[in-house]
Amino acid sequence: MARQFDTLDSDALRYHSEGRPGKIGIEPTKPAQTQQDLALAYSPGVAAPARAIAADPADAYRYTGKGNLVAVVSNGSAVLGLGNIGPLAAKPVMEGKSMLFKRFAGIDAFDIEVDETDPEKIIGVVKAIAPTFGGINLEDIKAPECFRIDERLRAELDIPVIHDDQHGTAIIVSAAVINGAKIAGKEVAKLRVVVNGAGAAAIACARMFLTLGIPRGQIVLCDSRGVVTRYREGLTPQKEEFATSRRLASLAEALHGADLFVGVSVADALTPSMVRTMAENPMVLALANPDPEIAYGAAMRSRPDIIFATGRSDYPNQVTNVLGFPFLFRGALDVRAAPINDAMN
């Protein structure tokens, strides 16, 4: 296994460094070959659209690329599977996100890495650059700060804002749960659910499960300290939403008889013995990246009736936000939706 990941690492480093470094670039959308082209593109012709936009800001969507441009904003404080690696180390991830916007939805995206941890300052930065963009994609900002940043920007900006770790993950995981339940022959509303991880993605998934009809009492949330219960002190408001009254101490205890495991946490958090205690036809969504909560081979060997998915593209049943966020933003940009609400999700 170590050799496999060593090979993947070397391949990835070569992929990113060969030719022009990185994964995104800028290409002109209008001709710039002649003196007349340049006169129209910049001085003096550019004054005409500038005056039009000053008179009517909506004309920015007619004369500029604003309506097809998204900012991918991160401070690198909570990169899935990598943790707090900071803004510079997060840049390859955000460039990758920008590339996926272009590849799957034709959306231009700039990665904006912000060297800041104060939520109010991040909010200020995003609001200051918002006139440039048709939408804002918040990415890999740690909880609980991310909740405040997301809520404020969604309320205060007139363009669509998505914290993809929350809303994008919840959409795709919910789709996987609906389809997995069909395969397992189970009703979604009767699923007994364990979510491992209590950050932005976990809370958003749990909230979305409520909209699918799963009762709050059937959802157990686990974090690095074990099961999130009502008897624990110091819970964040978001964790309090899903604190269980059941006397459970560990992930292993919570999984006894569970129908669904959703992992948005860390590698190796789940063991084959835990999987074997789950209900018939268990759904295991091990979504930590780059390494899932349980390795693919170990999961498949744990029991023959498992329905297993990861966040990786090199294994079957990939559950990844790329199945959702490009198309959600495509629709939101096309109709200038703000904000993006639960019904759209």
What is the predicted function of each stretch?
Residues 240-307, 312-316:
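Rossmann-like adenosine-cofactor binding region
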Residues 61-66, 102-103, 128-130, 154-155, ...:
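Solvent-exposed alpha-helices and their adjacent loops that cap or buttress functional pockets
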Residues 80, 87-105, 163, 167, ...:
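Glycine-rich phosphate/diphosphate-binding loop of Rossmann-like nucleotide-binding domains
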Residues 1-159:
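N-terminal ligand-binding/catalytic initiation module
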Residues 164-165, 184-186, 286-345:
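Adenosine-phosphate binding glycine-rich loop
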Residues 6-11, 280, 336-345:
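Glycine-rich phosphate/adenylate-binding loop
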Residues 111, 137-140, 161-164, 195, ...:
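General beta-strand structural signal in soluble alpha/beta enzymes
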